[in-house]
Amino acid sequence: QRENRRLIGRYAAGLSVWNGFAYTGGFSLAAALGGATRVVTVDRAPVAIEAARRNFALNGLDPQAHGFFADDVFTHLEAVRAQGLTYDMVIVDPPSFAPTAKALPAALAAYRDLHRLAMEVVAPGGLLVAASCSSHVPETAFLGTLVEAAAELKRRCRVLEIQSQPADHPHLPAFPEGRYLKC
């Protein structure tokens, strides 16, 4: 995800950022180092949130100037929405929702629900960074969850960039599942 961290850093200058499924805060750190005004980092694992805080400090950033929450991402997004808060950039990069091909229908429903919640807290004119690391979710189906979420909310969205895994993770044309990362 290093190329995606670079992109987030480039887009984040002057923005408020919310990052869910953040793990140790790679995207959060990229946004903060890129000049985000405030970054909220959410992951359900307290140990991951503590690591994210340490990563901010190790990179010369004051963790107290940002928000770190060990919480369920869906629950946190619902609370943010209920409070009427919005962010200029919202990042959602969950663990694989489709560990098997059989899980694809449930995974697509989960992505749609996640994307709808995320879109509800994106400020007008803001950015949603949505990622999937599941090899069982085709790119077109993943993009379809964004289209469905936007339609449910009667919001217009457009794609600025589509990224995949970097050159050091090549895939074979005959094995489309090898192109697992969509962002």
Where are these regions (language model features)?
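Mobile active-site "lid"/loop adjacent to the S-adenosyl-L-methionine
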Residues: 48, 87-117, 123
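C-terminal catalytic and target-recognition region of SAM-dependent MTase-like enzymes
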Residues: 86, 113, 127-183
